Amino acid sequence: MDLESAFFNTKDFELTDKKLGKGTFGSVYIARNLKDQQSYATKIIHSESGFDGETQMLLLRESLIHSKLNHPSIIKFKGMNFQSFTNPTQLEPSIITEYLSNGSLKDIFVKIEKNITDFHWNPTKKYIALLGISDAMRYLHKHGIVHRDLKPENILIDGNYHPKICDFGLSRCFPNLLS
């Protein structure tokens, strides 16, 4: 996907009240696409973060890097926008990605630790999950990208309990990758 075609129309989405998480610069909510009724994860940059030139460049860089990625263990980038979901005259940058229903790897660890889930990864499943994450990291490095923020919170789990890397906000790439 090229960045030019990555812009989405906020009118095509309905933002829900369900907050999935909060980071330094923004919060992540579920948004429903009104055309296909699919749910997507939507990272919205906090207005108090200030939407200056530096914030614009960070969002553009994250979107540019993420939009070029295609790997089964990396969350799918769907689009970006600078327009507010609630007030079309306001700037409120956002990024939309696929939505994964089982939360993060950290959420899974907490549930297992508190014994509030019947989910258990046997050694084979752990190995397969680790293999997926390491293959995604190999893919990133092969394409000149350094994630710089890999942690359990940035590894999301899909409906089949396969891990996917997300949040490319701190990522950097080597010069010739995006040319």
Locate each region found by the language model:
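Activation segment of protein kinase catalytic domains, centered on the conserved DFG
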Residues: 112-129
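Conserved short submotifs of the Hanks-type protein kinase catalytic core
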Residues: 88-104
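Short beta-strand micro-motifs within the conserved protein kinase catalytic domain, predominantly
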Residues: 76-93
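Catalytic-loop of the protein kinase fold
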Residues: 141-158
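Hydrophobic/aromatic scaffold residues of ePK-like serine/threonine protein kinase catalytic domains
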Residues: 68, 129-130
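Conserved N-lobe ATP-binding subsite of Hanks-type protein kinase domains
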Residues: 27
